[in-house]
Amino acid sequence: DRLRSRGLGDVYKRQVKNIISDNILPGDIYVRAKELHFATDVPRAVLLIRQTERTDMAALEAISNMFPDRQKDFVLSINETDLVLIKELTGPADSNKEVYEIAEEIEKKLHDDLNLKCVIGIGTTAKHLRVLADKYKEAQVAIEVGKVFDTEKSIIHYDNLGIGRLIYQLPTTLCEMFLSEVFKKNPIEALDQETLYTINKFFENNLNVSETSRKLFVHRNTLVYRLEKIKKLTGLDLREFDHAIIFKVALMVKKYLNSQNGEY
């Protein structure tokens, strides 16, 4: 009986791999699942696990052993760096908490057992088998967008990509046009590292001058002077919400263009 269930698990696994690889027509997914008595409309999470600094074949086994129910949870090897986990969810379908916890466990397991670093992209929950491929693509986008805008994060959910996702979908020509319109007076390159650091800290502290000067260990007047200097250079007063938004988006657009040109 164990052999039979293992065999069935392998058949299901092949089916799932065909779905996420787009090797099966959407209409056939339901028919094939019905033949196999494979549940089509249970909520499933799709996690893409990408090994970053080095790769190890043992990662596949390590993750597979974490999810022993081979008829419900599937760990697939996509290429030498990428593994995918399709995990049936038990909690509410719209709760990201369960999926985040799974991702954290995987990251810890790979780090503790194999000394591997990874990034994990999470798609939105698949409520039907036929949308698995879309959710897998979302997990891929989460990693790609995260690589540009959230470099310090190792677990990235598609739901939390925010403006980054929007920028990522823009043609580079449009991005370049936007930058030249925003920085009419001087190009963004005119701002030195210290100035950019000040700006980022100011954004992190919600445009609060007192709080930012405290975090930067500078006098309030020094920060005000720096903000005035930025205003002179760019024409944007970062103390004004609308100007701050334009500047924040411009910084993200610049980051995106750098990544497209291979400059991280």
Residue ranges and their predicted role:
Residues 13-19:
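Short amphipathic coiled-coil heptad-repeat segments
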